[in-house]
Amino acid sequence: MDTIMPLPTHFYTTQQLKQGEQDAASERGLELFHLMERAGQAVFTIAFAQYPTSHHWLICCGGGNNGGDGYIVAVLARHMGIDVTVWQLGDPEKLPADAHRAYQQWKELGGAVYAPQSEVPESTDVIIDALFGIGLKEVLRPQVVPLVELLNQSGKPIVAVDVPSGLCADTGQVMGTCIKAQHTVSLIGLKQGLVTGQARCYVGTLHYAGLGVEEVFAQHNTPSLVSIDGKLRHSLLPPRQACTHKGQNGKALIVGGNEGMGGALILCASACARSGAGLSAAMTHPDNVTAMLTITPEVMSTSWNKQHLFEERIEWCDALALGPGLGRDAQAQQIMQRLSSLKVPKVWDADALYFLAHNPSYDAQRIITPHPVEAARLLGCEVEEVEQDRFAAIRQLQQRYGGVVVLKGAGTLVDDGKEIAVCLQGNPGMASGGMGDVLTGIIVALLAQKIPLADAAKLGVWLHSSAADLNTKSHGQRGLLASDLLPHLRELLN
């Protein structure tokens, strides 16, 4: 996700923000109007920094306190010599007290207020979206939709106040239609709905302004979401001892790659070997063994039809990855039955999740890594329901299946039953085949190195997304392959 300055690592719900804003202001001895002034100042400062040569701003104000923030921006922009046009949705005389006070300041400057027009003024350089704030829980009213569409189609850059209008700040769901902002300025506390799912298409570059009350707010509110910190790798992966040997660095077993699906296993095994496992082994369909030995000679690859070797590998491994290219035939089902109860840390993906959906089980030693379609199958619901509230979906998955859940997608989430974490790294180039197989390989390598389940899942997701970001910085997003991530893993791990 695009940011300019490092963001805080904690995110909150709208309920926390609504009450916490008042409490923090009170504890600081501030009127809520003074907090509104600070909000407007923050939005103006960030917008002007992004568009310093702009001359004409269109500020769109709604009927709540978000609109009041917009009027403060209008006053500040006018003082800077910027031409300002204000569009007000609804009657400004019915604004809440603090927002009405801001409106009066604008009027005292001689500022005009207009109802939304059918066209955006041609001279507009910047649009400020102060229509709807964090309180939006319902689909936008039909009479508002044309305005949102007009602003989106104008081709003008949009800076959203706190949250793009039309986006649910708790879930990231688009409530019918939504402002597509180039920049969003989140105030006091970052909202959890800004960083996952559909929100990633609408927020643009995310900025944060604490308004001088962030410390007080944080003292009284437990985050509903935390971001994954890449510094985690330094504590989890300390420098290796000079006398270490491969057996001490973890033994990972990967089972998958049915007939015609060997590529998934090759990607997974390659990622495992590149992620620091001391020894990596694979059990696969006999058709894939030669390719595995040729492409990844570091991985000990054997046919899963050799039953005695299969059993030896099961006893040998420190961690298991099950599912990449496994298939859904009778043999795959037998393998699932044999390995389901294995008492080692494990990560299940792809076809393993298909079998899990049809034969649910709870396992505290397992990581599952569904994408939204797989998550919907595991929950017995529609994909749209998963994407409408990814937080609710991942909580249900963790409660039903245990262990750690990684809900993949834009703004991947990780839930260990204690907290939910989000990955801010990653980019649209990752929407290509084989990416999930690489993630599974990374995670099983970390598990084999005795990293706890939750930490392995979080660090694995961060490494995976960060490797993709490193590659696309040099080569662009379109055409990114899962195998392109492999060289960067070693760099990030060290």
Swiss-Prot record:
The keyword Lipid biosynthesis does not apply. GO terms for biological process: metabolite repair; nicotinamide nucleotide metabolic process. K(+) binds at N66, D129, S165. Residues 1-221 are annotated as: NAD(P)H-hydrate epimerase. Keywords: ATP-binding, Isomerase, Lyase, Metal-binding, Multifunctional enzyme, NAD, NADP, Nucleotide-binding, Potassium. Residues 371-377 are annotated as: NADPHX 2. Residues 65-69, 133-139 are annotated as: NADPHX 1. Binds 1 potassium ion per subunit. Residues 229-494 are annotated as: ADP-dependent (S)-NAD(P)H-hydrate dehydratase. Residues 17-219 form the YjeF N-terminal domain. Its cofactor is K(+). (6S)-NADPHX 1 binds at D162. It comes from the Bacteria. It catalyses: (6S)-NADHX + ADP = AMP + phosphate + NADH + H(+); (6S)-NADPHX + ADP = AMP + phosphate + NADPH + H(+); (6R)-NADHX = (6S)-NADHX; (6R)-NADPHX = (6S)-NADPHX. It holds the Pfam family Carb_kinase. Residues 229-494 form the YjeF C-terminal domain. (6S)-NADPHX 2 binds at G325, D437. Its EC number is 4.2.1.136, 5.1.99.6. ADP binds at residues 408-412, 427-436. PROSITE patterns: YJEF_C_2, YJEF_C_3, YJEF_N. GO terms for molecular function: ADP-dependent NAD(P)H-hydrate dehydratase activity; ATP binding; metal ion binding; NAD(P)HX epimerase activity. HAMAP family: NADHX_dehydratase, NADHX_epimerase. In the N-terminal section; belongs to the NnrE/AIBP family. Bifunctional enzyme that catalyzes the epimerization of the S- and R-forms of NAD(P)HX and the dehydration of the S-form of NAD(P)HX at the expense of ADP, which is converted to AMP. This allows the repair of both epimers of NAD(P)HX, a damaged form of NAD(P)H that is a result of enzymatic or heat-dependent hydration. This is Bifunctional NAD(P)H-hydrate repair enzyme Nnr. It comes from Vibrio cholerae serotype O1 (strain ATCC 39315 / El Tor Inaba N16961).
